[in-house]
Amino acid sequence: MELTTFWFAVIAFLWTGYFVLEGFDFGVGMLAPVLSRNEAERKQVLGTIGPVWDGNEVWLITAVGAMFAAFPAWYAGLLSTFYLPIALVLVGLIVRGIGLEWRGKVHSSTGRARADLGILVGSFLPAFLWGAVFADLLHGSATAALAGGIFSLSLCVLHGAVFVALKTSGPVRSRARRTAMITSAVALPAAVVALSGIPGASASVSDWAAAPWLWACALTAMAALSAGIALTWRGRDGWAFAATASSIAGTGAALFGALSPAPLPGLTIAEAASGPYTLNVLTWIGLVALPFVLGYQAWSYWVFRKRLVAEVS
């Protein structure tokens, strides 16, 4: 395998991992006001992501850093083309981080309400805009961007609801399951539209038919999403979360597969890549660093694997 292909695959993996992990973070942030009825339940909901949300953002930093080093032309073109939405994503991430950190340090109801608003807005912006950016990048139309944004937003909400059901107990868990079932009414149709090709977009369904494995990824994503909804209805929270995570992973595989070999219009992977020496150095750094990052993430999720209960004040 050529190093350019290898690093494109690594970047696709990093972005997909980011969407899987931050997807439920965004969903929990948006659902916190819906799933909680009092301060104890609000802490219970936000506590599901408290130990892991900042670690999940490392995937974004790593993905963007790898793009900058391995494919500087792709990095520059993507950020310049989508400057405004990406700037709004960064604003959202900053506001969300401030809200999550600040909330535990304020004791007034007004301060907590402002922090909750920051968490909500800071979760909504990236959940919607990342889908819009990548859909526009793939299809090149405003209709595609809107559909992609709705799909990613609904999928994050569903993924977050399933995660809360997995990590909590009592009334919050029941509400999370109901919310997941309600959200599925939007997520499933949005998945069909986004994954099968949007009418009027520049990349037609026939383009996908030329690569059967892309169809396989898209169909796997839709099947996993359907399975996640069914498993949630049956109360199999762990398997439901694995299914929604697989749906996001399948979507990521289909997305980056469709972006290859031209991640930007008129720019191929080979043209966007750094020189052989840079790619060789990056490969050695990646082989040493990535196992530690993955190992630490796995360890942190294992340590905080237990369900949370609402504290009685």
Task: Identify what each model region corresponds to.
Residues 1-11, 66-83, 134-145, 200-204:
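Helix-coil boundary and interhelical linker segments in multi-pass alpha-helical membrane proteins
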Residues 26-52, 68-76, 101-112, 161-179, ...:
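Juxtamembrane membrane-water interface segments of multi-pass membrane proteins
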Residues 1-55, 61-64:
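N-terminal signal-anchor module of multipass membrane proteins
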Residues 147-151, 280-295:
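Hydrophobic alpha-helical transmembrane segments
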Residues 76-89, 95-152:
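Membrane-interface helix-loop-helix junctions at boundaries between adjacent transmembrane segments
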Residues 126-139, 189-200, 250-266:
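Hydrophobic alpha-helical transmembrane segments in multi-pass integral membrane proteins
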Residues 141-150, 171-186, 208-213:
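Membrane-water interface at loop-to-transmembrane-helix junctions
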Residues 264-282:
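Short, membrane-exposed interhelical loops at transmembrane-helix boundaries
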